From Swiss-Prot:
Organismal lineage: Eukaryota, Amoebozoa, Evosea, Archamoebae, Mastigamoebida
Note, other: Ligation probably proceeds through 3 nucleotidyl transfer steps, with 2',3'-cyclic phosphate termini being hydrolyzed to 3'-P termini in a step that precedes 3'-P activation with GMP. In the first nucleotidyl transfer step, RTCB reacts with GTP to form a covalent RTCB-histidine-GMP intermediate with release of PPi; in the second step, the GMP moiety is transferred to the RNA 3'-P; in the third step, the 5'-OH from the opposite RNA strand attacks the activated 3'-P to form a 3',5'-phosphodiester bond and release GMP.
Reactions listed under catalytic activity: a 3'-end 3'-phospho-ribonucleotide-RNA + a 5'-end dephospho-ribonucleoside-RNA + GTP = a ribonucleotidyl-ribonucleotide-RNA + GMP + diphosphate; a 3'-end 2',3'-cyclophospho-ribonucleotide-RNA + a 5'-end dephospho-ribonucleoside-RNA + GTP + H2O = a ribonucleotidyl-ribonucleotide-RNA + GMP + diphosphate + H(+)
InterPro entries linked to this entry: RtcB, RtcB-like_sf, RtcB_euk
Residues of the active site: 458 (gmp-histidine intermediate)
GO BP of this protein: tRNA splicing, via endonucleolytic cleavage and ligation
Name of the featured protein: RNA-splicing ligase RtcB homolog 2
Tagged with keyword Nucleotide-binding: yes
Assembly, per entry: Catalytic component of the tRNA-splicing ligase complex.
UniProt key word Manganese: yes
Length: 535
């Protein structure tokens, strides 16, 4: 047996490589951890017999955590498994909540029929970020968990296509970056340029993107290319606290901060010509725009409000208090579900208002109408949400509440819940990379419905804490590297650029290729950035 001190003396070479690529949160005094070999990797000895390696999966066996209702799993190739083994060492030596443990913990919740994590997963609040957890609703104890959705409710991504080519905007790139940065407020606490009344804000929470269409800020056809057509039913604004409303009503059309961004991109490679054509993307060099943001202060406050309510109720006593929840059909469960839907509708409208500003900015700089530039929405997807869906459980159709936290719905061809335009190819899943790297568009598969509740990854996935990124990297170097790559970067606080550096994230290509190898989604095309707007 080997003994591991995770920062210096690991004997497993693969673990050492993971160690170089992954960075912990606050370090605590080290403890020696005895390790054993697992398929060529060093894992803590206490986990002996707790895992099974399958193609593109790490199966976490029932019993890894007491009270698990079944096995759990993480989709990963060998390189991504390296990172997980390092987290396991930290879990034991530092009491660090690893993604593996969090995925297993979620499998203990009442009513759960599946707990899994995507290749981009990393530890988060209670649930891993990249986690998918489904509970069967014919179990009266099945819970809904605010922490299983996260603080940025309906954080999501949308992609807008154009008929422009790279050469059409190359000479206007700097001015276009400036105009987008001016038109779209970004950064912590920023407010929108268009202020809505409290009454209108309630309408936005009920109607989502429909409100923008009715008031001339979005196109009718945008609705058909948005998950849930941009409006989730059962959204009652009276269940959203005044403090949450006060944080959100001036933020419709704002980007926010952290890993949220707007990118002007070009199509770099098309892997599935027919699927790309269905999306209106036909040429290498075609210009697209990607937007990644969510429900801003509104979603954060709603999540906190209902976490507090769930904890006070004492109904659910999970193995980790951050997993707190209540039965879905209980009064608090239904109140949270409705308030969450209000935030989701706000987020659809937020991305819709940003799109309105993008279209204006392109018109200002290029002196063409947005319709002439074919600035149509390809798709808008959520990746922090809980939804009622029908899935096969034990060979029966069962209604489930599916929590996706840092995971994208990716339904297969012919699924009734996707747009008619995409019935033949499957639901598009928009996957953003890290700052300065490529992004991808995927589509769902039939196998994904069986393996992952119709879910795939949502991005690259953080491997380095923000604090550690700032310690190890310099923002000046990150900004200079973007310039050398020919990328126009506009960022509200340049001192924080290192937080979002490429080195702080996993390789998005490796992530999406793992999803494809696991057959839970299929790669359609790749994009690379020309302009990056950050909060």
């Amino acid at each position: 047996m080997a003994k591991s001190r995770y920062s210096r003396k690991n004997k497993g070479k693969k673990l050492q490589r993971a160690q170089q690529n992954t960075v912990s949160t606050e370090e605590k005094p080290e403890q020696e951890v005895e390790t054993i070999d697992f398929n060529g990797f060093q894992i803590p000895k206490v986990y002996d017999g707790k895992f099974e390696r399958k193609p593109m999966e790490l199966e976490i066996k029932k019993g890894f955590v007491e009270g698990m209702n079944g096995d759990a799993k993480i989709f990963c190739n060998d390189d991504l498994l390296n990172l997980l083994t390092f987290e396991m060492i930290k879990d034991i030596s530092n009491n660090y909540p690893s993604c593996v443990r969090q995925t297993a913990n979620a499998a203990t919740l009442p009513g759960v029929v599946g707990s899994l994590a995507m290749p981009d997963a990393h530890s988060g609040y209670g649930f891993s970020i990249g986690g998918v957890v489904a509970m069967r609703l014919d179990d009266p104890e099945a819970v809904i968990c605010p922490g299983g959705v996260g603080f940025d409710i309906n954080c999501g991504v949308r992609l807008i296509r154009t008929n422009l080519q790279r050469e059409d905007i190359e000479q206007h790139k700097a001015r276009l970056a400036d105009e987008l940065f001016k038109q779209i407020p970004s950064g912590v606490g920023t407010q929108a340029q268009i202020a809505f009344s409290p009454e209108d804000f309630d309408s936005i929470m009920k109607e989502g993107l429909e409100f923008l269409v009715e008031n001339g800020y979005a196109w009718e056809e945008d609705l058909n290319h948005c998950e849930e057509h941009g409006k989730i039913a059962n959204a009652d604004p009276s269940l959203v606290s005044n403090s949450a409303k006060s944080r959100g009503y001036k933020q419709v059309g704002t980007l926010g901060s952290g890993n949220h961004y707007l990118e002007v991109q070009v199509v770099d490679e098309i892997m599935d010509v027919e699927a790309a054509k269905a999306m209106g993307i036909t040429e290498i060099g075609q210009v697209c725009i990607m937007v990644h943001c969510g429900s801003r202060g509104l979603g954060h406050q709603v999540c906190q409000d209902y976490i507090n309510l769930c904890m006070k109720s004492g109904i659910c006593n999970p193995v980790d208090k951050q997993l707190t929840g209540v039965p879905f059909n209980s009064p608090i469960g239904q109140q949270y579900y409705s308030a969450m839907n209000c935030c989701a509708n706000f987020a659809f409208a937020n991305r819709g208002m940003i799109t309105y500003r993008i279209r204006q900015a392109f018109e200002t700089v290029l002196r063409m109408k947005p319709k002439k530039m074919d600035m149509h929405l390809v798709y808008d997807v959520c990746h922090n949400i809980a939804k009622v869906e029908e899935h096969d459980v034990d060979n029966k159709k069962v209604q489930c509440i599916v929590h996706r936290k840092g995971a994208t719905r990716a339904f297969p061809p012919q699924h009734p819940d996707i747009s008619e335009d995409y019935k033949e190819i499957g639901q598009p899943a928009i996957i953003g990379g890290s700052m300065g790297t490529c992004s991808y568009v995927l589509v769902g598969t039939q196998e994904g419905m069986k393996k992952s509740f119709g879910s795939t990854c949502h991005g690259a996935g953080r491997k380095m804490s923000r604090t550690k990124a700032m310690d190890n990297l310099t923002s000046k170097d990150v900004i200079n590297r973007m310039k050398e790559m020919g990328i126009e970067l506009r960022i509200t606080d340049p001192k924080l650029a290192a937080e979002e550096a490429d080195e702080a994230y996993k390789d998005v290509t490796e992530v999406v290729e793992t999803c494809q190898a696991a057959n839970i989604s299929k790669i359609v095309l790749r994009l690379k950035p020309l302009i990056v707007i950050k909060g």
